[in-house]
């Protein structure tokens, strides 16, 4: 596994929680928005995204609901209160880790 893949894998959960912060979104919309916002660095395939969303739902960080849009059913995901608290904590920890790593790399 390449170093970039390892780094990305370690931050995938944080990236998905952050993407859900702006409101409910269905999986493909989440994938597209994250890919576009990160210039393709985070481009989750279904084999990564759906199990992660399921895990976040089991941990009660995310909830989901089915909606009919244009005649098709889509599952929309949103952060729960617990998910928002976790996101705040993860951001704080990420920024501290990133700051510490910057001091090593400089």
Language-model segments: residues:
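Absolute protein N-terminus
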Residues: 1-2, 106
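Short beta-strand/turn micro-motifs at beta-sheet edges
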Residues: 2-6, 65-66
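N-terminal helix-turn-helix DNA-binding core of bacterial DNA-binding proteins
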Residues: 5-48
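Short, conserved catalytic or interaction motifs in soluble domains
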Residues: 22, 58, 99
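Short, hydrophobic-biased segments on the C-terminal half of alpha helices
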Residues: 50-55
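Beta-hairpin "wing" of winged helix-turn-helix
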Residues: 57-73, 78
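Basic, amphipathic "hinge/linker" alpha-helix immediately C-terminal to the N-terminal HTH DNA-binding motif
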Residues: 72-91
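Amphipathic alpha-helical dimerization/coiled-coil segments
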Residues: 85-106
């Amino acid at each position: 596994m390449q170093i970039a893949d390892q780094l990305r894998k370690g931050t995938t959960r944080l990236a998905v929680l952050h993407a859900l912060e702006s409101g409910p979104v269905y999986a493909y919309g989440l994938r597209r928005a994250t890919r576009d916002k990160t210039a393709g660095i985070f481009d989750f395939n279904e084999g990564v995204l759906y199990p992660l969303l399921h895990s976040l739902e089991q941990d009660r960080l995310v909830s989901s609901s089915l909606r009919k849009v244009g005649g098709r059913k889509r599952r929309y995901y949103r952060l729960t209160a617990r998910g928002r608290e976790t996101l705040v904590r993860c951001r704080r920890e990420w920024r501290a880790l990133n700051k510490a790593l910057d001091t090593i790399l400089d």
